[in-house]
Amino acid sequence: MKNIPLIGYTDKLSLRPGETVSFKVSSTLKKSFSASLKRSISADPNPKGIGIIEKDASKYFKTSFFKSRKQSFNPGSYAISKTPIKVSIKNNLNLSVIIFPTLFSSKKQTILAFDNVEIYINSNRATSIRVGNDSISIKEPLILRSWYKINIKISLSGKISISQKNLKNKNKNGLINNGKISLNKVLSGKVSLAAVVSKGISHNHFNGKIEAPIINADGKKIGDWDLSANTNSAFVDSIIGPKLLLKNFPTRAVTSSKWDSSEMNWQHKPGHYAAIHFHDDDIYDFEWDTDFKFKIPNNMPSGIYIMKIKGDGNEDSMPFFVAPKINKTKSKICVLISTFTYSIYGNHARVDYKDNWLNRIKEWNAYPYNPANYKEYGLSTYNYHSDGAGICHASHRRPLFNLRPGYITFGGSKSPCSGLRHFQADSHLISWLHNKELDYEIVTGEQL
């Protein structure tokens, strides 16, 4: 995973006087980095224009220094129970789940994990079950984009059975493999889907859909989750057992094994949309710790501001947008800042991007990073996941390259035009208002 030496983001894009913005920074520098406040007037790096213009705003925030520290991020969506499950087993443990794999990998892909029991797809594309250090697998590989019902039975006597049935191929018998394994009498821990989680970090992400996970001990259900329920939430309510928390926003209300195209609205027939689609590159919130905060002063004018951080020849700019207090507007001109557009297009990796775009970036001293080269930072809803599915969710709670002064959207043009969109292009209006000495205030899409 490629890391940028100095980069950050804010917890909020839209603020008013009296509200506080938090800055979250990752720095691999050996020394501290500085932070200074600027008011952004022009974000266009084109040398044939007025260039990037940023006015000093240190009267509101004095330049300060902060200790460098690297902050990591963990792409990949998964589900994990809010609380642990503890069960004493007298005879046997049964697990079942329905899956629809969408991308194979040379690495293990976890489907369901509980304590030292794990259902996964191995590097040979076969369904496997691990208990402790022992495992067995189905002898035939899975077929991509096919629905499978997986059943596991493990007994304290040491017997284990794994069966797999292709739900769309009624003419083919299910596959079974048996073996011997040692099962602990007591199992305890959180249940996870689509990844195994250790010390809060997820690994071995599954690409595909998961439906109807059930855990049964001695004929009694201890975990049963209907993934078609409350699909507008980041939690999955349980039929039995603890709720599941969804991390990194997997796609909900997707077609499941019973879907037959008879209903296109998931709300009318939720049983046909009872799966969740997980991806190894889902990312929503980096969840970095806060390095410093800034409370917007009452006398700070409405406008576009950036917190510029610098160190060892590296720099980054974190924009935020300050609107006036409600019912305290002074200007006759209001500029709408499209923060929703900025977020949805956040880190849009263009299909026409080429490395020669870096030539113009270097010549213009423009923003040096492009999401096409840093896809692990999460892409936009105009891009695709690693398995080819469209990206459904995007947020500003991560560094957004295209929300930076000097970012060039279209770098391949031979013409002298700036090649801008969104934040940088919108700054043409802001710089014009300043040039004409026209008083204005802003409001963002989030604030409307």
Q: What do the predicted segments below correspond to?
A:
Residues M1, I7, N91, K185-G189, ...:
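Low-complexity, Pro/Ser/Thr- and charge-rich linker/hinge segments at domain boundaries
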Residues Y9-S32, S36-A43, I50-I52, A57-P75, ...:
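Ligand-binding face of N-terminal immunoglobulin V-set domains in extracellular IgSF glycoproteins
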Residues D11-L13, P84, T102, P297, ...:
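Residue-level recognition of the GNAT/N-acetyltransferase active site
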Residues R16-T20, S146, K199-K209, D291-V335, ...:
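Conserved, well-structured beta-alpha core segment at the onset of a catalytic domain
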Residues P17-S22, D44-S262:
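Extracellular glycan-associated modules
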Residues V25, P84, N91, I214-K221, ...:
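Extended amphipathic secondary-structure runs
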Residues K30, K38-S40, V254-Y284, N314-L448:
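Aromatic-Pro/Gly-enriched surface loop or interdomain linker
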Residues S88-K90, I143, K185-L187, M300, ...:
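Extracellular/periplasmic catalytic domains that process cell-envelope and extracellular macromolecules
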